[in-house]
Amino acid sequence: MAFTTRRRVEFRDTDAAGIAHFSAFFFWMESVEHELLRAAGIAVVDRDGDGQEVSWPRVSASCDYTSAVRFGDEMEIVAGIASIGRTSLTYGFRFTHEGRPVAEGLIVAVRCLMHPGRKPQPVAIPTELLDRLAPYRLPDAPAGPA
């Protein structure tokens, strides 16, 4: 089962031609990612069992565009877990407007211990979190973790 939500193209999301600016899709993907995590009962920033801060920095993001949307258009966004690695999640996103494909994107996020002033340290995704994410696996997603 994928996660489905909606977003309306706001004036701030458009370019001089009144079309949704490419960068807005990255904001929408991150926003929907956070919404999916909340639906799964997972905090974006949390503490592990030892009280250390844990979060999900993005290490890759991409988006391919197939048609334009404009100010006021409402899109349906379908998101889900495309693949799971030992420390990473790959989210897939599909944007449509009135049934017409608009864009598809991917975000790769890595579960990390966050140490102020130091590089984030990747850590394994706990089984409990994998279980919470299971309902959001995309139908054609590999079984993982890799």
Language model features with spans:
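Terminal targeting signals and extreme-terminal segments of soluble enzymes
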Residues: 1-76, 82-146
